[in-house]
Structures are given as C-alpha cells and as structure tokens.
Amino acid sequence: MTAPIRFFKGDKLMLLDNVPPSHTLLELLREDLGCTAVKEGCNEGDCGACTVVLGEADQGQLRFRAVNSCIRMAHSVNNMALWTAEDIAPKDVASGSDTLHPVQEALVQCHASQCGFCTPGFVMSLFAMYQNHTSKGHAISRELAQQELSGNLCRCTGYRPILDAAQMLDALPLAQLM
C-alpha cells in the first residue's frame, strides 16, 4: 500500500503518489527525483554524504535541520520543506544562470574540497547552520562549526579548510532563501 507525499523541494511543491512506505528519503531523491548531489556513502547515517536540510515551523519561525536522508523514511517529510545541494544556488536575474550560495562560495574560497564526494553533504550542513545562525546576524564560532558538522566525514581535505569556510560565512553577502 502506498500513500501520497506532499512537500516543498526548494521552491517547488512536490506531490508524489505511489511512494512505497519502505522507501527512504535517499531513494526517493536519487531514484525517483534524480537528485544526484545527494550521495549514498555508508547507508547507515554515519558519513553525512546523504545530508539534506528539512525546514519545519517551530514557534512561528522556520527551523532548519540537517538530516541523513539514508536513514529517514520518505513519508516522514510530508508537509515539510526540503533542500538539497541542487536547490540552494540563487539564479542571477540578469543572466538566468545559477550563482553560488554563500556556503558554496566559502568552500571555494577556502579550498575546502578535493574529491568532492562529501562536498554536497557539507554544503547542506553548512546551509542549515547558515540559515539558523548567519542569516539572523549571529557569528559562527569554531566550536559551533565543529558541533554542526560533526555528522559529516571527509577523507581527503581534512577539516581545517571546511571549518575556515564555516567561520567566514558572516563576511559574505547574505543570500535570500528561495
């Protein structure tokens, strides 16, 4: 038996029928919606390669949470907002092309990626941190960055440039949430 799911993915309302109750959010995103930036690493919720951000109302405000899509069931996002790395880059009005979100720009400026497999997961954890802290005028300390990124593993770059990127977010222009 299947039930429909309704959620926002980025700025688009998704109405999906016939999603099996056994489907994980990762399976829904990669197999059904073609979101290839969401990676399957460990499939146990330990590496963070599959990180997406969920938004839900919390005391009248939108609260952002980075979650592992490999261990979250697809139907659990019903009536929520969801972002993947494909959803956060704003469009340039003049050219119509994507620009970089500040978290992506910070990672580029700090040379915080090598092979790139873990990068979308780090982008999304940084995006949640950005929305919950930087966009509200709060600086990000090294300790906060370490705590917020503790669910993401990188085997190539090391964590110093990634933590540097997190700490420079408040120095970049603010991005509007789509």
Give the predicted meaning of each segment.
Residues 1-178:
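Signature of N-terminal electron-transfer/Fe-S-associated modules in redox systems
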